[in-house]
C-alpha cells in the first residue's frame, strides 16, 4: 500500500475511512454483450462524461514528449510514480524525458492541497492562465481547482498550434515576432497550405499539467493505482466531475478502490483513441468519434479473446 512509502512526504497522511460499496458492479468493457445502438450509446456516454476540452477547442494531447517531476515525496515512491506515468506515456507513442529534464507534468504532494493550490495560483498566476484564447478551461474552472475538495486535483494548459510548423496559433500576451513594433508582430503567422471546410491545420497540444495530491486522502491506494490515476488525468483532458461509476475505470479508484488495480480496458482504449486520432478534422465531435471507435475495437477484441478461451463442448 502506498502509505508505506509516504513517510518521506512533506506532511504525513492519516488513516482513512473505507469507501462505501458501490450499488452495482461497474461495467467491464469485455462484458458488454449488447449490440448496435445500445453499445454505441454506452461508449458515447463514457466519452462524453470523461472528455473535457477547453472551450471552443478540440481535444488536446501531448505532441512529442513528456517529462514528469514529483515533489515532496520519498525518493522511492517519487521515482515509481515518475517511471509509471512515463511508461503509460511511451505506450501512447510519446517520448519520456531523460533525468534532469524540465518537467511539463509536475506532481506535488501535500497535506494542504487547497492551500497549496491557492498559493500557487496567486503567486504564479501566469503558470495557470497564460492569456491565450483556448489555452485553459477558464476562470470558473480555476476557482474549482482551488476550492473543490478532491484527493487529486489537476490543472492543464494547452496550446493551439500550426500542425505544419508547431508555431502557436493564438496571440499570447507578452510574446511577439519580428521587431515587435506593430500589431502584426503580436499576432500568430499561419500559412494555409490547403484550404478546406473539413480539415484544419490548427491542433491542440498539451503543454503543462500540474497535479496536486492530498496525502491525507490517498493512503488507501496502492502506488500503481495512484500512478495510473495521475497518468490518466495528465495525458488527457479529463473532466474532474465526470461520473464514471457505471464503468470499470481507474477514475473511480477513490470511490471504489477494489474495482481496478490499474488502468482498465476502458481507460486504455480511451487513451489509445486519443493518441491515434487524426487531429486535422474540423470539430470536437471528430475527436470524440475516433476515441469511441477505439473503444469499440477494444471491446470487439476482448470479446473475441473471451470466446476463444471458452471450453469447446463435446
Spans of features found by a protein language model:
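Short coil/turn linker and secondary-structure boundary residues
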Residues: 2, 37-38
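Long, folded non-catalytic interaction modules
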Residues: 69-84, 89, 93-311
Amino acid at each position: 500500500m502506498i502509505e508505506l512509502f509516504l513517510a518521506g512526504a512533506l506532511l504525513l497522511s492519516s488513516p482513512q475511512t473505507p469507501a462505501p460499496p458501490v450499488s452495482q458492479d461497474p461495467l467491464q468493457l469485455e462484458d458488454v454483450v449488447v449490440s448496435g445502438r445500445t453499445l454505441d450509446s454506452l461508449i458515447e456516454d463514457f466519452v462524453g462524461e470523461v472528455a473535457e476540452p477547453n472551450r471552443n477547442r478540440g481535444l488536446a494531447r501531448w505532441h512529442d514528449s513528456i517529462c514528469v517531476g514529483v515533489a515532496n515525496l520519498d525518493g522511492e515512491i517519487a521515482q515509481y510514480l515518475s517511471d509509471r506515468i512515463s511508461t503509460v506515456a511511451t505506450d501512447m507513442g510519446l517520448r519520456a524525458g531523460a533525468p534532469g529534464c524540465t518537467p511539463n507534468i509536475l506532481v506535488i504532494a501535500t497535506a494542504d492541497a487547497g492551500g497549496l493550490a491557492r498559493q500557487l495560483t496567486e503567486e504564479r498566476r501566469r503558470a495557470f492562465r497564460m492569456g491565450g484564447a483556448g489555452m485553459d478551461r477558464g476562470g470558473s474552472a480555476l476557482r474549482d481547482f482551488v476550492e473543490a475538495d478532491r484527493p487529486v486535483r489537476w490543472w492543464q494548459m494547452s496550446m493551439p498550434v500550426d500542425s505544419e510548423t508547431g508555431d502557436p496559433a493564438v496571440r499570447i500576451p507578452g510574446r511577439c515576432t519580428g521587431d515587435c513594433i506593430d500589431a502584426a508582430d503580436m499576432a500568430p503567422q499561419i500559412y494555409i497550405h490547403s484550404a478546406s471546410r473539413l480539415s484544419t491545420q490548427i491542433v491542440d497540444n498539451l503543454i503543462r499539467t500540474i497535479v496536486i495530491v492530498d496525502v491525507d486522502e490517498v493512503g488507501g491506494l496502492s502506488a500503481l493505482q495512484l500512478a495510473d490515476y495521475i497518468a490518466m488525468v495528465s495525458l488527457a483532458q479529463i473532466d474532474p466531475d465526470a461520473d464514471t461509476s457505471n464503468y470499470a475505470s481507474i477514475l473511480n479508484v477513490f470511490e471504489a478502490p477494489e474495482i481496478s488495480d490499474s488502468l482498465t480496458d476502458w481507460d486504455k482504449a480511451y487513451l489509445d483513441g486519443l493518441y491515434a486520432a487524426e487531429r486535422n478534422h474540423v470539430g470536437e465531435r471528430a475527436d470524440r468519434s475516433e476515441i469511441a471507435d477505439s473503444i469499440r475495437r477494444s471491446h470487439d477484441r476482448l470479446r473475441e479473446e473471451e470466446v476463444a478461451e471458452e471450453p469447446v463442448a463435446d
